[in-house]
Amino acid sequence: MTEFRSGFVCLVGRPNTGKSTLTNALVGTKVAITSMRPQTTRHTIRGIVHREDFQIILVDTPGLHRPRTLLGKRLNDLVRDTYAEVDVIGLCIPADEAIGPGDRWIVEQIRATAPKTTLVAIVTKIDKVPKDRVAAQLVAVSELVGDSAEIVPVSAVTGAQVDIVIDVLAAALPPGPAYYPDGELTDEPEEVLMAELIREAALEGVRDELPHSLAVVIDEVNPREDRDDLIDVHALLYVERDSQKGIIIGKGGARLREVGTAARAQIEKLLGTKVYLDLRVKVAKNWQSDPKQLGRLGF
């Protein structure tokens, strides 16, 4: 009988390299927010991959970048703290973009903070380019990370090679116990997941300045008194400027209603019951650079 393996795997990379989509594909359900906008993951979300002979706990971090605000610095600190604590680092590099200074900077950060941690390079988004481009990117990634790191191409969207990624990550884990019971897919509280789902819906199709400026806080969650099958969820969406409030709400409140409809459908799946979702938008000026407001909003 093979020895049970378990441990923590951190997926890292530049913003928008497919880390959250890959987390969801590996776990088999939605535990991390995905958006076409970079820098949309704010919290370290753990997804859990269960198999008969191993358990992988995935830590999905924000994209590492050179910080411009206090929030950016805190997010980067979160990533570096994570590097030092995990068993394996999965470096995500997309197949459809040339390796650049950002990728090299991240490899330098990994080598400086976690030189002994096993590194696996994961070439993501292979469905977006022809096979010869994938092959060329594999060579370029090999030159970047060196001979000691294993390299795996994957498409989280089509599912191609997802099982291979799981096998490679599991093989690098140490022997250990199952940290979580079978069937548990994340250790994030439901309120955090609900806030992330609302945030994802609110970010869909909006201008570039909004992702960094939007925070969502769940204010109240209560079962409806006269109905067993309905839960009331009240959420606050915080932006930094009045102009951003207008973007979220839309003409005559149309966009906020769309956000509510999309988020409610996802929250109902998460909770397994009908949901009444009440969304309110507030302005918290320059919250990304204000330590007190960052703390109040959960950072």
Swiss-Prot record:
Signal peptide: none annotated. It is found in: Cell envelope; Secreted, Cell wall. Residues 206-285 form the KH type-2 domain. GO terms for cellular component: cell envelope; cytosol; extracellular region. Residues 154-156 are annotated as: G5. One of its GO terms (biological process) is ribosomal small subunit assembly. InterPro entries: G_ERA_dom, GTP-bd, GTPase_Era-like, KH_dom-like_a/b, KH_dom_type_2, KH_sf_prok-type, P-loop_NTPase, Small_GTP-bd. Residues 39-43 are annotated as: G2. Its main location: other. It comes from Mycolicibacterium paratuberculosis (strain ATCC BAA-968 / K-10). Residues 124-127 are annotated as: G4. PROSITE patterns: G_ERA (PS51713), KH_TYPE_2 (PS50823). It comes from the Bacteria. This is GTPase Era. Residues 5-175 form the Era-type G domain. Residues 60-63 are annotated as: G3. Belongs to the TRAFAC class TrmE-Era-EngA-EngB-Septin-like GTPase superfamily. Era GTPase family. Pfam families: KH_2 (PF07650), MMR_HSR1 (PF01926). The gene is era. GTP binds at residues 13-20, 60-64, 124-127. Exhibits GTPase activity. Binds RNA but is probably not involved in ribosome assembly in mycobacteria. Keywords: Cell wall, GTP-binding, Nucleotide-binding, RNA-binding, Secreted.
